UniProtKB/Swiss-Prot annotation:
Record-annotated membrane-spanning stretches: none
Coiled-coil regions listed: none
GO CC annotation, single: cytosolic large ribosomal subunit
Family according to the record: Belongs to the universal ribosomal protein uL22 family.
GO molecular function: structural constituent of ribosome
Chain intervals for the UniProt region annotation (Disordered): 161-187
Protein's name in the database: Large ribosomal subunit protein uL22
Domain of life: Eukaryota
Biased composition, class Basic residues, residue ranges: 169-178
GO biological process entries: cytoplasmic translation
UniProt keywords, alphabetically: Ribonucleoprotein, Ribosomal protein
Length: 187
């Protein structure tokens, strides 16, 4: 069992999955992972399937040099987006693995949220390509390590309404407080 970069807050209500040295582009996978971070599990699976079918795009925010614009990226507040099919398939497989781990721990799968997802660079794999005049250039691949942690969503606690007998205090800015103090000092 490998070491995870972050342990969940409540290990009894969470599950983990990871993949090492995966032959999928690091940059595309990073952007795909950032798009599904903090999503509910069901929505993330549906979103990745839509990416594979090119119905929704992955917004490219960090590694966006030379990435073309697409209209589907507008819903994320950006202009650049792509449909990294292989990255989506690898992440979908990892989410299914984490979901089966959740079933094994008897967690409620419908309440799972992607609490933590991280993509790290793995050691590059070298190949070579032959060029003109007897030269040889490197032909590198950029694999990655992926880890994901799912947690059950906590129920939101309802806020207690203020009672009528105690009036709610009005919040004042620092400027107004200073003016009030000045008035008090003058009087």
């Amino acid at each position: 069992m490998g070491r995870y970069s972050r342990e969940p807050d409540n290990p009894a209500k969470s599950c983990k999955a990871r993949g090492s040295n995966l032959r999928v582009h690091f940059k595309n996978t990073y952007e795909t992972a950032m798009a599904i971070r903090k999503m509910p599990l069901r929505r993330a699976v549906r979103y990745l399937k839509n990416v594979i079918e090119k119905k929704e795009c992955i917004p490219f925010r960090r590694f966006n040099g030379g990435v073309g614009r697409c209209a589907q990226a507008k819903q994320f507040g950006t202009t650049q987006g792509r449909w990294p099919k292989k990255s989506a398939e690898f992440l979908l497989q990892l989410l299914r693995n984490a979901e089966s781990n959740a079933d094994n721990k008897t967690l409620d799968v419908d309440r799972l949220v992607i609490d933590h997802i991280q993509v790290n660079r793995a050691p590059c794999l070298r190949r070579r390509t032959y060029r003109a005049h007897g030269r040889i250039n490197p032909y590198m691949s950029s694999p990655c390590h992926i880890e994901v942690c799912l947690s059950e969503r906590e129920d939101a606690v309802a806020r207690v309404a203020p009672t009528d007998d105690a009036p709610a205090k009005k919040k004042l800015s620092k400027k107004k407080l200073a003016r009030q103090k000045e008035k008090m000092m003058r009087e």
